């Protein structure tokens, strides 16, 4: 704890609240959830891929007419921050549409999947094996039958019901490449935290259309629990059309290469 270079308030909170008053419970709790441990090989792979994709992104950015900061100098500072944090520069020439509920997002996504010509990449934290989840699977099956390359990555905990269903096998039989992010198994529990999950919600079609936001592949009734007076989640997504979709595709490809055996190269 003292050697982990955590912020001083965080270190003091662990010491004062748990470790000093109840040493055994405190040490056990810290070992369980105190450190963000993803496994050394995973961290090293992520760093290596991040560096590689960042270099390719720089070449892409400099090779095209993407730098708009000379025209909007007041945004140059925040653009630099975004580039450092996200490993991709802000890109101009995009059309954005807000999809304020699950129905509109799922309908638009299925329509774009049905119109896909080359590739579809999807990464979601929660993918339910019912309703909208089945509809998206059916759309991916149609796309794969047309010769579109499809890759699907879901979180091992958030999408556990989907993973245990027959839908992943349906996708594989249709020719869709499927992988599980941060899979849970007894060996991994010894060396990495299983509560650290991949919460991303990304879909990219043909490298030009992308979806992101808070909406998972679920119906609008997801999370509705009337007995405890909890209503359904109200999520929103953004549909992006333009070069910014490629930045989201880089995020997907980086995660995909870590979780699958496929090396995509360029």
Question: What is each residue range found by the language model?
Answer:
Residues 1-266:
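N-terminal localization/anchoring segments of enzymes in phospholipid and broader phosphate metabolism
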């Amino acid at each position: 704890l003292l050697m982990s270079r955590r912020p001083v308030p965080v270190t003091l909170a662990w010491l004062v609240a748990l470790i000093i008053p109840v040493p055994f419970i405190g040490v056990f709790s810290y070992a369980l959830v105190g450190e963000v441990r993803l496994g050394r090989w995973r961290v090293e792979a992520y760093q290596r891929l991040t560096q590689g994709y960042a270099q390719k992104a720089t070449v892409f950015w400099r090779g095209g007419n993407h730098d708009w900061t000379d025209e909007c100098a007041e945004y140059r500072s925040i653009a630099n921050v975004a580039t450092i944090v996200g490993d991709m520069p802000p890109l101009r020439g995009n059309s954005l549409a807000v999809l304020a509920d699950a129905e509109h997002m799922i309908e638009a996504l299925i329509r774009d999947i049905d119109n896909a010509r080359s590739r579809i990449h999807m990464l979601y934290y929660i993918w339910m094996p019912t309703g909208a989840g089945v509809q998206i699977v059916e759309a991916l099956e149609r796309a794969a039958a047309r010769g579109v390359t499809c890759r699907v990555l879901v979180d091992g905990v958030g999408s556990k019901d989907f993973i245990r269903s027959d839908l992943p096998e349906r996708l594989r039989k249709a020719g869709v490449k499927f992988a599980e992010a941060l899979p849970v198994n007894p060996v991994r529990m010894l060396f990495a935290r299983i509560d650290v999950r991949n919460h991303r919600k990304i879909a990219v079609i043909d490298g030009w259309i992308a979806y992101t936001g808070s909406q998972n592949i679920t119906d609008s009734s997801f999370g509705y629990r009337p007995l405890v007076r909890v209503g359904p989640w109200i999520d929103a997504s953004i549909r992006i059309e333009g070069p910014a979709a490629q930045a989201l595709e880089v995020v997907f490809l980086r995660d995909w290469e870590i979780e699958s055996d496929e090396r995509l190269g360029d």
